[in-house]
């Protein structure tokens, strides 16, 4: 019974701490888009879509549209 109470109190304290820190950090990151694109390499930024004539499927993204397994 004591162990159950201790576990419940610990979970409540940890939850409260997470909620407090989440509210404090709200709006702290000013430039989200700048930071997310800075982590990407140049090859990831330039090869987002496949050119026309390339094979396409579920996992590949065409610059135009995928028609019968080829980018158009």
Swiss-Prot record:
<dbReference type="GO" id="GO:0090729">
    <property type="term" value="F:toxin activity"/>
</dbReference>
<feature type="signal peptide">
    <location>
        <begin position="1"/>
        <end position="22"/>
    </location>
</feature>
<dbReference type="GO" id="GO:0005246">
    <property type="term" value="F:calcium channel regulator activity"/>
</dbReference>
<keyword id="KW-0872">Ion channel impairing toxin</keyword>
<feature type="disulfide bond">
    <location>
        <begin position="62"/>
        <end position="71"/>
    </location>
</feature>
<keyword id="KW-0800">Toxin</keyword>
<feature type="modified residue" description="4-hydroxyproline">
    <location>
        <position position="55"/>
    </location>
</feature>
<keyword id="KW-0528">Neurotoxin</keyword>
<dbReference type="GO" id="GO:0044231">
    <property type="term" value="C:host cell presynaptic membrane"/>
</dbReference>
<comment type="similarity">
    <text>Belongs to the conotoxin O1 superfamily.</text>
</comment>
<keyword id="KW-0108">Calcium channel impairing toxin</keyword>
<comment type="function">
    <text>Omega-conotoxins act at presynaptic membranes, they bind and block voltage-gated calcium channels (Cav).</text>
</comment>
<keyword id="KW-1218">Voltage-gated calcium channel impairing toxin</keyword>
<feature type="propeptide">
    <location>
        <begin position="23"/>
        <end position="48"/>
    </location>
</feature>
<dbReference type="InterPro" id="IPR004214">
    <property type="entry name" value="Conotoxin"/>
</dbReference>
<keyword id="KW-1015">Disulfide bond</keyword>
<dbReference type="InterPro" id="IPR012321">
    <property type="entry name" value="Conotoxin_omega-typ_CS"/>
</dbReference>
<dbReference type="GO" id="GO:0008200">
    <property type="term" value="F:ion channel inhibitor activity"/>
</dbReference>
<dbReference type="GO" id="GO:0005576">
    <property type="term" value="C:extracellular region"/>
</dbReference>
<keyword id="KW-0964">Secreted</keyword>
<feature type="disulfide bond">
    <location>
        <begin position="49"/>
        <end position="63"/>
    </location>
</feature>
<protein>
    <recommendedName>
        <fullName>Omega-conotoxin-like SVIA mutant 1</fullName>
    </recommendedName>
</protein>
<dbReference type="Pfam" id="PF02950">
    <property type="entry name" value="Conotoxin"/>
</dbReference>
<keyword id="KW-0732">Signal</keyword>
<keyword id="KW-0960">Knottin</keyword>
<feature type="disulfide bond">
    <location>
        <begin position="56"/>
        <end position="66"/>
    </location>
</feature>
<keyword id="KW-0638">Presynaptic neurotoxin</keyword>
<keyword id="KW-0379">Hydroxylation</keyword>
């Amino acid at each position: 019974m004591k162990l159950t109470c201790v576990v419940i109190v610990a979970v409540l304290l940890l939850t409260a701490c997470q909620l407090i820190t989440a509210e404090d950090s709200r709006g702290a990151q000013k430039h989200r888009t700048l930071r997310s694109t800075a982590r990407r390499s140049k090859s990831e930024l330039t090869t987002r879509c496949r050119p026309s004539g390339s094979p396409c499927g579920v996992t590949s993204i065409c610059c135009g549209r995928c028609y019968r397994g080829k980018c158009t």
